[in-house]
Design a protein with these regions (language model features):
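Short, solvent-exposed cationic patches
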Residues: 157, 201-202
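Short, solvent-exposed mixed-charge patches
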Residues: 209-211
Length: 211
């Protein structure tokens, strides 16, 4: 059942499905608007919208701290990314934050991405160009989360932020500051970063440039 703060992308993300499949099974069309209390089918034969509804434990959304334009500009000018922004032609990925890699991709161990330790308030950057499809706190365990849709295949997620500098629907370019690192939903300051390909988690280190 859809709850306040849910979106098609967060629901699909939580259960490990491709958002396009969830949209198809439920006859949803862009921009995929959901109603609170709506029941969604989350599995079944791809040839028709059938399956079983799933009851999920979703935290109620909190207000999203938004950094002011002046603060965002100041952050961008005082911090320099370790990688250059990708061109539209190459579509390359870049590291989303500076810091120490403290956790690697280990889906069997419960980690669908990597964790980068850093300082509170340090910039978090879009790993590639795309569009912000979610910014909020509605997904348990991720704190203040941003999800970016890069194309029909790839999504990326940036979790545990202190504040965001973008809004849902905003286009972003690779290297653009999208948030401030924090520890919302975590015990220490870190960025949890994930990449999903066709709805499935993949190892970000297979896509990011080698350090």
């Amino acid at each position: 059942m859809v709850r306040a703060g849910d979106s098609l992308y967060t629901i699909a993300w939580e259960v490990g499905l491709d958002y396009r499949d969830v949209a198809f099974w439920n006859s949803l069309e862009p921009p995929y608007r959901l109603e609170v209390g709506q029941e969604l089918f989350l599995g079944g034969d791809l040839s028709r919208p059938q399956g079983q509804s799933v009851t999920r434990a979703i935290v109620e959304p909190e207000s999203v701290p938004l950094v002011t334009e002046d603060t965002a500009v100041q952050t961008q000018t005082t911090e320099t990314s370790t990688s250059t922004a990708p061109t539209q032609a190459t579509g390359a990925w870049i590291w989303p934050a500076k810091g120490e890699l403290i956790s690697r991709f280990d889906p069997d161990g419960g980690s669908n991405g990597i964790d980068i330790a850093g300082s509170d308030g340090s910039p978090v950057r879009a790993a590639a160009k795309g569009k912000v499809v979610y910014a909020g706190t509605g997904l348990r365990g991720y704190g203040l989360l941003i999800i970016i849709k890069h194309d029909e295949t790839f999504l990326s997620a940036y979790a545990h932020n202190r504040a965001v500098t973008i809004n849902e629907g905003d286009p972003v370019h690779g290297g653009q500051v999208i948030a401030e690192m924090g520890q919302s939903g975590a015990d220490t300051v870190r960025l949890h970063f994930e990449i999903r390909r066709d709805g499935q988690p993949v190892d970000p280190l297979s896509y990011l440039p080698r350090l």
